[in-house]
C-alpha cells in the first residue's frame, strides 16, 4: 500500500513538473476569445483565477482549463459517496459559468497542487469563552494573519473585550478599551498584501457594549483603522428605545445577568451619530442582529 501511494505521489510530481505553462499574452488571448471580446473579464480571470505557482507561472490557458480542474477534483471526492456525479457531468455544470459559479477562493484553490490556498472566501474567527486577555487578543491577531495569507477575508466581533477603564491584572491597571485593538487588527490587515491587494477585514461590536460609541467614532479621525470595515450590531431593544425616546442600558459582559460595568445612554442620540458618521465616512455599517438571528439559521450562520 505504501509503495502504491509513493508511486502515485511520484506520478503526480512528474505531472506537475512537466505541465505546460502559458505566457500572460497567451492566456489573455485565449480568455478573450472565451469571453467573446470582454477584455476586463479576460484580464481579471488571468490575473486572479488562472492556476499559478508561487513564481507566477500560469498553468491554465482559459476558464475551460479551470473548469476541467474543478470538475476533476470534485469528481474525485464525489466517488466516495452514493450516486456520484461524473467529471463530465460536473464540467457541464461549470462550463461557461452556466449553472455553478464558485467563489473566488474555491476557483483558485480547488485542485491547486502548486500553492496552499483557502477553499472559502470568508471566515468569522474568535476564541471560545473568556477571550479578552492580551494573550487571547494576540492569538486572534495571529489567526487573522494566517487566514489572510491564504486569501481569506476575516471578520471578528470585539464585544468580548473589556471596556475602557475596566480593571486588569497587570501594571497598566486599567483596560485601554476597544479602539487600540481595532487599530492593531487594522494594521495587521494592511501588512498582509498579495500583489498589492490588502487583506479584507470586518470588525463588529454590539451596541450594548459600553465602548460602542468609541467604536462608532473610531474611523472619523483620518488615518485611523484604515485596514478594516466596521459594523455595529443593533438589537431590537435599542431600536425600540430610539422609537420611544427612552434610555438604553449598555453593559459588560454584554450577555451577563450580573454585569460588572453598566451605564445608561440616550439611544436616539447614539442612533443619530451612527447615521451622521455613515453619511460622512460611509461607516459604520449596521447589522440588525436580532433580525439576522430570526431570519437565518442561527446555529449555521450566526
Show the residue positions of the predicted features.
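Extended catalytic cores of very large enzyme megasubunits
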Residues: 2-302
Amino acid at each position: 500500500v505504501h509503495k502504491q501511494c509513493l508511486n502515485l505521489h511520484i506520478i503526480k510530481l512528474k505531472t506537475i513538473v512537466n505541465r505546460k505553462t502559458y505566457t500572460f499574452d497567451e492566456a489573455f488571448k485565449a480568455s478573450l476569445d472565451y469571453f467573446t471580446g470582454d477584455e476586463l473579464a479576460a484580464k481579471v480571470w488571468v490575473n486572479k483565477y488562472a492556476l499559478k505557482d508561487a513564481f507566477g507561472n500560469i498553468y491554465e490557458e482559459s476558464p475551460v482549463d479551470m473548469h476541467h480542474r474543478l470538475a476533476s477534483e470534485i469528481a474525485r471526492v464525489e466517488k466516495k459517496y452514493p450516486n456520484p456525479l461524473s467529471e463530465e457531468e460536473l464540467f457541464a455544470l461549470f462550463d461557461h459559468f452556466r449553472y455553478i459559479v464558485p467563489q473566488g477562493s474555491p476557483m483558485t484553490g480547488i485542485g491547486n497542487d502548486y500553492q496552499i490556498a483557502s477553499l472559502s472566501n470568508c471566515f468569522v474567527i474568535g476564541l471560545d469563552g473568556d477571550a479578552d486577555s492580551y494573550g487571547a487578543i494576540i492569538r486572534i491577531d495571529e489567526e487573522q494573519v494566517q487566514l489572510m495569507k491564504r486569501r481569506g477575508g476575516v471578520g471578528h466581533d470585539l464585544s468580548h473585550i473589556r471596556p475602557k477603564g475596566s480593571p486588569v491584572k497587570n501594571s497598566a491597571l486599567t483596560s485601554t478599551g476597544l479602539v487600540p485593538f481595532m487599530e492593531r487588527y487594522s494594521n495587521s490587515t494592511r501588512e498582509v498584501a498579495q500583489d498589492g491587494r490588502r487583506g479584507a477585514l470586518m470588525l463588529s461590536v454590539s451596541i450594548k457594549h459600553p465602548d460602542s460609541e468609541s467604536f462608532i467614532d473610531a474611523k472619523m479621525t483620518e488615518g485611523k483603522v484604515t485596514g478594516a470595515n466596521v459594523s455595529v450590531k443593533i438589537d431590537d431593544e435599542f431600536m425600540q428605545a430610539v422609537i420611544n425616546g427612552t434610555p438604553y442600558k449598555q453593559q459588560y459582559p454584554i450577555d451577563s445577568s450580573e454585569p460588572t460595568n453598566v451605564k445608561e445612554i440616550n439611544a436616539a442620540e447614539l442612533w443619530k451619530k451612527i447615521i451622521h458618521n455613515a453619511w460622512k465616512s460611509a461607516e459604520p455599517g449596521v447589522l440588525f442582529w436580532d433580525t439576522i438571528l430570526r431570519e437565518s439559521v442561527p446555529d449555521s450562520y450566526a
